């Protein structure tokens, strides 16, 4: 029987194939990281030749460099690219459990990254309150901070969709005979990482929505009373707690260090075990 010929768009752009989505993640993350690297170079040049960029621009470059490298670079490469490409292959699955969800995960990531970078074209520049987006500065910063928060909501949605997909794929689509104790170490690393993301990202998603409401609607979840800006008391409503944001942010950002390192350790462990021709001990 004749196979249905896929169009260019369905095969390469809106692909549902786990391998191609992994490649999309990797290539897109590489471009984002190159942009983040360029920001770092300009910041270093500013240190040598003071006055090259303004202090506000320097702050924006620092905030966006950190955001790009963590949320648009390393995590999408280590989880999105390697995870999507290798996990189904290592467990004998034909594809991820939810191919359309996988495609949606990538495009949420892409839209989130582009949304954040749009901040550079807005009046006042990109987000400039650090990659941690600490209030109260983040609550009174320029419009770039608003698009940073919108982009972060897309990125969190992407990570949650991808993590659920990896968990379900690993649990349900393992080839017959591949028991838990026979599971490749890299797959274990991706599985644990996915559980960490599913547990840690929702609080930041909620916090991002709250901070967006502080900026756009006029709430004061993180806006303290009596904030003095430019020698005058800020007119925004107070009563909120900047410390609450820090708790919610670091509920994600501390597990994030394990999200960054666990898949990398899984890759190194697989390579070492394969090359020395001995199974992992432990």
Place the predicted regions along the sequence by residue.
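Membrane-embedded and interfacial regions of multi-pass energy-transducing membrane proteins
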Residues: 1-282
């Amino acid at each position: 029987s004749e196979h249905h010929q896929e169009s260019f768009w369905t095969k390469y752009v809106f692909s549902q194939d786990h391998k191609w989505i992994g490649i999309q993640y990797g290539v897109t993350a590489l471009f984002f990281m190159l942009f983040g690297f360029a920001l770092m170079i300009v910041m270093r040049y500013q240190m040598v030749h003071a006055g090259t960029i303004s202090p506000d621009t320097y702050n924006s470059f620092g905030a966006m460099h950190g955001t790009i490298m963590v949320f648009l670079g390393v995590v999408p490469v280590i989880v999105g690219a390697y995870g999507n490409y290798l996990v189904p292959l290592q467990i004998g699955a034909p594809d991820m459990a939810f191919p359309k969800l996988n495609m949606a995960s990538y495009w949420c990531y892409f839209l989130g990254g582009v949304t954040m970078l749009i901040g550079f074209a807005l009046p006042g520049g990109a987000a400039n309150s650090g990659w941690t987006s600490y209030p109260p500065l983040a609550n009174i910063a320029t419009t770039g901070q608003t698009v940073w928060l919108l982009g972060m909501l897309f990125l969190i949605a992407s990570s949650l969709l991808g993590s659920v997909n990896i968990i379900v794929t690993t649990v349900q689509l393992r080839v017959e005979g591949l028991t838990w104790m026979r599971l490749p170490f890299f797959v274990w690393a991706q599985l644990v990482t996915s559980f960490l993301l599913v547990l840690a990202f929702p609080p930041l998603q909620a916090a991002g929505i709250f901070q967006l409401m502080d900026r756009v609607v006029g709430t004061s979840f993180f806006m303290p009373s009596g904030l003095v800006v430019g020698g005058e008391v800020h007119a925004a409503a107070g009563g909120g707690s900047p410390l609450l944001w820090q708790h919610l942010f670091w509920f994600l950002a501390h597990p994030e260090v394990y999200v960054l390192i666990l898949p990398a350790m899984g890759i190194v462990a697989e390579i070492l075990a394969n090359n020395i021709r001995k199974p992992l001990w432990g």
